[in-house]
Amino acid sequence: MSLIELLFGRKQKTATVARDRLQIIIAQERAQEGQTPDYLPTLRKELMEVLSKYVNVSLDNIRISQEKQDGMDVLELNITLPEQKKV
């Protein structure tokens, strides 16, 4: 190690710096809570299509949420089904 490197440090390669910055950005995006994933509206629509084949249910009766619990992502789906008439 030369005296200049010792005083001024080693210059990192731009690829290494870019990779490190990208990893920080990705980690920050993953850590953000309260944001819904992009696929939830599509999931909701497709669930509605499938459910409508079997049960008369409105879009207002389907609730989809995503949250973190104990370090894990949890996708919660609540569907309020209409009351069935007893025969």
UniProtKB/Swiss-Prot annotation:
Annotated Pfam families: MinE
A GO MF label: identical protein binding
Signal peptide span: none
GO biological process, any: regulation of division septum assembly
Keyword Cell division: yes
Gene3D superfamilies reported in the protein's UniProt record: Cell division topological specificity factor MinE (3.30.1070.10)
Transmembrane segments: none
Alphabetical list of InterPro entries matching this protein: MinE, MinE_sf
Family under the similarity heading: Belongs to the MinE family.
Descriptive protein name: Cell division topological specificity factor
Lineage: Bacteria, Pseudomonadati, Pseudomonadota, Betaproteobacteria, Neisseriales
